[in-house]
Amino acid sequence: XGRNEFVIRLQXSEA
């Protein structure tokens, strides 16, 4: 994880 996880979580929440 890391910074990538931050974006993935935000996108997943929107999806």
Curated annotation (Swiss-Prot):
GO cellular component entries: cytoplasm
Keywords from the UniProt entry: Carbohydrate metabolism, Cytoplasm, Glucose metabolism, NADP, Oxidoreductase
GO BP field: glucose metabolic process; pentose-phosphate shunt
Official protein name in the record: Glucose-6-phosphate 1-dehydrogenase, cytoplasmic isoform
Catalytic activity: D-glucose 6-phosphate + NADP(+) = 6-phospho-D-glucono-1,5-lactone + NADPH + H(+)
Pathway involvement of the protein, from the record: Carbohydrate degradation; pentose phosphate pathway; D-ribulose 5-phosphate from D-glucose 6-phosphate (oxidative stage): step 1/3
Entry EC number(s): 1.1.1.49
Subunit structure: Homodimer.
Binding site for NADP(+): R9
Originating organism: Zea mays (Maize)
Subcellular location: Cytoplasm
Entry function: Catalyzes the rate-limiting step of the oxidative pentose-phosphate pathway, which represents a route for the dissimilation of carbohydrates besides glycolysis. The main function of this enzyme is to provide reducing power (NADPH) and pentose phosphates for fatty acid and nucleic acid synthesis.
UniProt GO molecular function: glucose-6-phosphate dehydrogenase activity
Broad class of the protein's primary localization: cytoplasm
Sites where the protein binds D-glucose 6-phosphate: Q11
Family: Belongs to the glucose-6-phosphate dehydrogenase family.
Keyword presence, Methyltransferase: no
